Amino acid sequence: YVSDDFNQQMFEAHIAPVFDEKSSAATKKTINYVDLCSCFGNTTMATLHGMGYEEIRDNWSNETRCMTIDKPRRTFNDQSTAVTAIDISPQAMKYGKTVGLYDTTIVCDLNNRTSNEFKLTKDAMSNADIIISTASLVYLELETIEELMEAFVTGGSENGMMLVNFLNPFALEKADATKRILLQKLDFVASRATRHRRMSKLEQDNYPGEEWSLLELWVLQKKKK
């Protein structure tokens, strides 16, 4: 999706500088990065590997090409980055780990909040420094979002930051409810709106006059204590 260029720009403008700041040897550590509802990792390719829209398209040009990620994973002020990916698709998780996009994977139906995998997801969220969740929160129940955000804000780095997307024109009331949850638990940093993808014929019939689905990109940070 063309929107990953804009996710990359938001990441570079508002998240990367926080973790690129000079730190003493005593505080040097691994940056824990969580891709929530990661699918096959396009946004991680954009944010951590610096790949643009055309490069990501080229990555998926054939079954051989997609097995090599050309650009290396970035570091933050020489701190290593550990990537945890969480998604319902075992195929996506296997791919991401095989090609080196992900270090740890959790296959989880996030709306099943009694599963062991959901507990593992909450543990990952509580240890996260950076979380991205792009064009995916709409699929999660509000109770799931509430629990995951609570796990994030009660653990991990004081500088924890998050990049999320809201789809438009779909499920706008749910998007508003999700925003209220996020703003209760996190501080707002920045936002922008972008194109996401062309709408299908059925979608255009359901939303007359619309040709593109849009994304609203938000960056948030943990509230200062």
Ranges and model annotations:
Residues 117-130:
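A short acidic, Gly/Pro-enriched loop at the edge of an enzyme's catalytic core
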Residues 143-159:
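A short glycine-rich, Lys/Arg-flanked "PGG" loop and its adjoining helix->strand segment in the class I
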Residues 188-225:
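Class I S-adenosyl-L-methionine
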Residues 28-40:
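Conserved class I S-adenosyl-L-methionine
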Residues 1-28, 50-54:
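Class I SAM-dependent methyltransferase Rossmann-like catalytic core
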Residues 41-114:
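Class I SAM-dependent methyltransferase SAM/SAH-binding core
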Residues 128-143:
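A short SAM/SAH-binding and catalytic strip from SAM-dependent methyltransferases
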Residues 156-170:
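Conserved beta-strand signature within the Rossmann-like core of class I S-adenosyl-L-methionine
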